[in-house]
Amino acid sequence: FFLIADYQALGDHLNDIDLIRDSVLQVTLDWLAVGLDPEKSAFVIQSYVPEFAELTMLLSFITPLGMLERNPTLKGELADLDIERRSVGFFNYPMSQVADILLPQAHLVPVGDDQLPHVEMTREVARKFNRMFANVFPEPDSLVGRVPRLSGTDGQGKMSKSKGNVIMLSDDEKAVTKKVRSMFTDPNRIRADIPGKVEGNPVFQYHDAFNPNTAQIDDFKARYREGNIGDVEIKMALAEAINTFLDPIRERRAYYESNMSLVEEAIMDGVARMRVIAAETMKQVRDAMRISSYTKNWK
């Protein structure tokens, strides 16, 4: 299951619904462009499945406030948010993320390493529900990729569209090259003959992720540490590698942009499949909590 969490996007984009609407389309196009098969993977818009909201509400009653307050992602985002925009809905979005995982009864969740605490929180909530009521939810495991997180192109935290430090899957060759040329490197290396730091350097992080030529990467790293290579050579090789990686993605994206009925079909089919599973999960939840049949014996 691949989820577009549009409810959660309301937390900091409530006054820009058009942005959310466009993002739903762009994310779906990205999924199709990278080769996800909608017959094997269900694409789901969160608000199209009301059981997500219901499960969020029910699980919030068994979740201590302190568990949300300890969530590192929430703490960081609250610090960056004006106090007037700190809504109850925004504060509760980690609970919504828990429901995102538990409603389809997921066993494995692909995440970046910054989301590991969230999956652990989901496991805690699942354990507590199962202990209090009935064994309904599996405890999901995390799946972290070979590159657990990509830094932003400016070296400031992870990629963020709002911060403008991101390379989009839809970027053309010229845009990618421009962004790569301006990427943050080692700030202490002001000349090509000064030894540089590879560790934590976004340019090398991206090489590791997108450049299949490992011999070239090893050569670049060795020469960079020795002060025998300039940033421009490394960045131009990276731009070429990323553009080569993106070429088939751009081609598939153009196809789906010309066949929007297939995009809508992918979403609606995924939502329909999710609704079947969601209904069964919520029946188990309501039965376990004994809130599904108040009037059963009213005779």
Give the residues covered by each predicted segment:
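N-terminal Rossmann-like or analogous alpha/beta NTP/dinucleotide-binding catalytic cores
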Residues: 1-99, 254
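Active-site-proximal beta-alpha loop/turn segments in soluble metabolic enzymes
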Residues: 10-13, 103-107, 158-159
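Non-membrane alpha-helical structural segments and their capping/turn regions in soluble enzymes
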Residues: 18-25, 116-119, 264
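A generic secondary-structure signal for well-formed alpha-helical elements
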Residues: 28, 35, 63-67, 106, ...
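Short helix-capping/linker segments at secondary-structure and domain boundaries
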Residues: 65-69, 103-110, 211-220, 250
